[in-house]
Amino acid sequence: MGSTLPTTYKRAFFEKQDATLTLEEVQLIEPQRGEILVKVEACGVCHSDHFAQMNLMGGGFPRVPGHEVVGRVAAVGDGETYWKIGDRTGAGWHGGHDGTCGACKKGLFQMCDNEQVNGITRDGGYAEYVLIRSEAAVRIPDHVNAAKYAPMLCAGVTVFNSIRQMNIPVGETVVIQGLGGLGHLALQYANRFGYRVVALSRGAQKEEFARKLGAHVYIDTSKEDPVAALQKLGGAALIVSTAPSPELINPLIEGLGVLGKLLILSIVGGIEVHTGLLVSERRIAIHRTNSIVRSLLTNSKVGKGKSIWSWPSGHATDSEEAIAFAELQGIDCLVEEFPLEKCNEAFGRSSSTTADRERVFLADFTGLTTTAAMMDGSVRFRAVITME
C-alpha cells in the first residue's frame, strides 16, 4: 500500500451476539484482487445493522456493521482497472455476487445465491477504512454531502428501486405507511415519480411535515379508519409499508383498489395474512382452527387481483440511479450526525421506541421550525456516523 496510508485505523465492532459496539485500533489490511480499500467519510446507521449484532445471517464475530458507506478509494487490489485511487465511492447492502447463478445471469445481482452483505457477512463501514468488493462498489458524485447521501445506499435505493419495479402508471394513488427513515424518502420519490401520494401515519402533528415532503393527502390513523379513507379515494394502486406494524397488514390489503399491490419494505416479523382479502370483493369471516387461518369467501364473484410484494434493495447500478434521481429531483435525506466515538448512541437511534430518542433537529428543512420538527411518535430519521 502507499506510504501515505496509516498502518492502523479505528473501527467499531460487535465482539459477540447481543453485545454493544467496541472501539479498537487495528492494523490496516491491503485490498486483495477484486477489492478496493475505502477511506470512510460517513456511514449511515440502519435498523438492519441489528442483523450483525444478533448474527441473524450467520456472518459471525467479530463483525464491523454498516452498509451505507460513502468515502474515497485509498488503495486497489491487483489487476483493478475500473476504480482508481481518489475516486468517490460507496457501499450499500449488496456486498458482492458470484456472477454465475440464475439471478446474476438476469442482472439481479442483489438476489445472488451467494451474495455477500456489507456489514453482515463481511465487515462494514463503522470504521475509518473498509474493504469493498469492486463489483459491488457504487460510484458517488464528488460534490454531494457524504452524510446526507450515505443513507441513499440503503434506505434511498430500497424505496426508489422497489417502487419503480412495481410498474404503477403515473397518476395513480400510491400510499406510504410510516414517516421514518424509509418513509420520508418514499414520500419524496413517489411524488417525483408522478403519483398522487397519500401519507398514512398516526398524529395530526405530522401532517404538515408529510405534505412538505410531497404528500397530497394525509390520513391520521388515530382519528379515521384508513380502509374507509383509502376506499373513499378509490383504493390504492400501491401501498408501501415502511413501518413495522403487523396489525396493519390486513387493513392495508383492504385499502387496495383493483389490481392493487401491497409492497412490504419494513421488517414486520410473523404475520397472518387473510388471503380472502386478496380475492374477495367483500369482507370475509376469519376462523382459526389449529393455528391455521382459514378464509371463508362470502361470494363467488371474481376477485380484485390484489397482491403482496417485497423487493430486496438494489445493486450498484440501482444505487447510482437512485442517487442521480435524488439529485435531479431535489430529494433530501434527513440525518443526525455522530462521531465514531459515539457509535453506540447512533446505533441506539435505529432501535429506540421512546419519543425522546426519536427526536431529530430539522430546522433547516423546508421551512419547518425546530419545535414543529421535533415530533413525538414513530417518526424516525437516519443516524449517520461521520469520520474526521
Swiss-Prot record:
Residues where substrate binds: H67
Annotated positions binding Zn(2+) 2? C101, C104, C112
Q: What is its EC number?
A: 1.1.1.-
Q: Which residues bind Zn(2+) 1?
A: C46, H67, E68
Biotechnological application? Answer: Patulin was originally used as an antibiotic and specifically trialed to be used against the common cold, but it is no longer used for that purpose since it has been shown to induce immunological, neurological and gastrointestinal effects. Genotoxic effects of patulin with dose-dependent increase in DNA strand breaks in brain, liver and kidneys have been detected in mice. However, more recently, it has been proposed that patulin might also have anti-tumor properties.
GO CC annotations on file: cytosol
Q: Which family does it belong to?
A: Belongs to the zinc-containing alcohol dehydrogenase family.
Q: What is this protein called?
A: Alcohol dehydrogenase patD
Organism lineage reads as:
Eukaryota, Fungi, Dikarya, Ascomycota, Pezizomycotina
